[in-house]
Amino acid sequence: MNAKPSFPMSLARICLSATAVAALIGLSSPSFAQSPASGSPPKLNDRRPFLAPGARTSEDPVRIPMRPVAEDGPELVIRGGRLFDAVSGDTRLATVVVQGNRIKAVLPPDATGWAPDAHIIDAAGKTVMPGLIDMHTHVTYPDRSSPFDEQGSEGAGTLRGQRNLRYFLESGFTSVRDLNGVSNAPFLLSQWSAAGMIPAPRVFAAGWIITGTGGHATERPSIPSHGPEYAKEVDGPDAWRGMVRKAFKGGASVIKIASHFAPDEVRAAIEEAHLLGLKVTCDCETIYTEMAVDAGIDMIEHPLPRSDAAIATMAKKKIAAVPTLQVYQNLLDRAGGFYGSTSRRFTMTSQGNFDEFKKMKAAGIVMGVGTDTIGDASLMVPNSYIAELKWFVRGGYSRIDALKAATIVNARLLDMGDELGSIEAGKLADIIVVDGRPDENLDDLAKVEEVIKDGQWLIRDGELVTPRHVSTPLVKPSPPADVK
């Protein structure tokens, strides 16, 4: 797990100069298009060879990054805590120094010599670890308190998402991958978080879900969350390509598709997304999972029924999974099982889904941690996430490996393993301080006291702290100088 991912950097992370942009315009021509040979899975389009030597890449999940945090502010020193090394799984006493939005150094616990204006966090007896990452959220989804006539509203969804993102931040999450929401609300939240306009984790947004007519997330069209503001129904390869492009235009960091679809449709969607530099994840089951893995999907969501052959193909092609075990345990245990969205001839059960997880674990499939926070589930963090980690342990993971999955593994699946997921000099400063030892007791993850996201100390002693607004100086003409 120590090696960096082999897949190329997403276009969403490339900061281009005007010259580089001009050079990249030609990529749409046939001579540059990386269309796969017939029958072979499409590969991600790596634009890095076209950049000028030494060109910087962005640090946020937006194609045109916002101005980075200034690097001339006071240092933030997290002193003498138990540092959880998410790469090795070891813990050791250390002091972490943050400058601007990056980790400046990881030093011995008794290191000294800070500037007089340095901010000091005394982490003695506490665990210092990378910020948590949730790989499957729906922060703009309505909950039971949402009025029915507001559930399809982009404005209401944006406000609801801002509230839910605060809950995630307070719980120690510094990144979430949001896999379906109302209209453009997830894109707005992603942009606002990246710009520092709202206190929130980084948001890697899919925007909406793409499916065939009558497919998943459209089963109950009378409900707003199963309507066109949340799910886009398309038919035919060209329509699937077009919807991928629309999501890209809106600001997607990832593409989410769902069954049902035809083989040529799923292949077209994956090919188009990969040409744009985006990865694709799929919510699917049975034969649709086989179609997706054969077409070159990057990831499969949920522990839904799939054949042993599909699992073997996932392992061979290094296709990852995000099993979302806890939410399915709740859903299936309460109902005793339910029918798949594309067939009423079989039911899914909690034990059957857990068996799928264990098969994937045995096959060596890399699995990320996500909660599938639909409805009131956003109100249940961090308990829902801790429960998810416990299911990982029940399925064969050690506590250490579960925490690695929650941090560095998730970061690598986001194509951000070089910037997030571990506390190392030079990486972005996404750090939490936990009053306990989560590597020994996962329940201690509920005791997050400090959260630093992008170098900003946002949660202090468990409370959200936002800087006071500083008025911008007036432009000329100035007000009357002789008036007091």
Place the predicted regions along the sequence by residue:
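Active-site core of metal-dependent hydrolases
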Residues: 213, 257-354, 373-376, 396-398, ...
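C-terminal cap of metal-dependent C-N hydrolases
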Residues: 81, 428-469
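Histidine/acidic-residue-rich, glycine-tolerant segments that coordinate divalent metal ions
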Residues: 195-292, 303
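Divalent metal-dependent hydrolysis catalytic cores, especially in the metallo-beta-lactamase
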Residues: 160-186, 200-207, 250-259, 279, ...
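Histidine/acidic-residue-rich catalytic or RNA/ligand-binding cores of hydrolases
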Residues: 143-146, 186, 290-296, 325-340, ...
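Metal-associated gating/positioning segment near the N- to mid-region
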Residues: 126-192, 213-217, 221-223, 292-295
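His/Asp/Glu-enriched, well-ordered alpha-helical/loop segment
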Residues: 152, 275, 351-437, 457
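Histidine-rich, glycine-flanked metal-binding segment
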Residues: 58-75, 83, 88-129
